[in-house]
Amino acid sequence: MQQSPQEILLAEPRGFCAGVDRAIEIVERAIQKFGAPIYVRHEIVHNTYVVNDLKAKGAIFIEELADVPPGATLVFSAHGVSKAVQQEAEARGFSIFDATCPLVSKVHVEVAKLAKEGYEFIMIGHKGHPEVEGTMGQLDHGIHLVEDVEDVARVQPAQTAKLAVVTQTTLSVDDAAEITAAVRARFPQVREPKQQDICYATQNRQDAVKLLAPQVDLVIVVGSPTSSNSNRLRELAGRLGTRAYMVDSAEELRTEWFEGVTRVGLTAGASAPEVLVRAVTDRIKALGAVSVRKMDGIEETIKFPLPKGLKIDAATGLEITERTPETGPARG
């Protein structure tokens, strides 16, 4: 008789972070205030369920600003945009709300500040990721992308007297540390951020997987294929020696994954809503799991304020003009 899973161990923390919460709320409140449609440049966050849910509410997701009609309301995604995109959007006269995660904006501000002081940059990140494109697009030149240690050996900055390193916020903490060490070894005078650019939520979710993986036979990560931080969670569990799969929904779970498994670890990327975690939990319980246990973990209480003009009382629909700090229950 094949053994079925007996216990589900839930990573803590998991799922939505403050930047994702804020980005989704910006789109929802813009629709509430201005009416549908609201245009969003790129997926607001990299999650299929979230994007489809917002589409149903009246959001239209576009990649090219030419696809947005004159006078429309436009939201920039949580990943941030380049200066060129921002300037083009302003020139086209859109009503713009910026849902860029404040921790990504922090990197943009640092790049702009140091560039004025004559710095060049080495950026650690994944080529083609919208966050990387947005950060590199803060300057016309002088940012060199490296994806691995081998790239560090090949990079050729114009000068090394003033050189700084920045990173994509959703990288593997361990990979970023290894690449940063290689940068430091080649350019000993390189300036590093006062605080690492990898965000608190990425760090916390990876730390939770490090605790989770050794205690289970299988790790399931809830997240979409385009989600960088979700992919890093799956890779991390595998690197720790635990078989791991990533699913966009409960329907993607395969029965054969659970053969011979007694304890399943479950986590979710920072853009994956808790409703998907519950659906995956229910599916695993249907396969035989009889208990669900939450791990001890860090409680995240960070909440980022909304842009001016979108602080709306949910009960009355009226704009809130004075409310500090912005408070409310965590999403999911």
Where are these regions (language model features)?
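The feature marks the mature, well-folded catalytic cores of soluble enzymes
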Residues: 1-268, 274-332
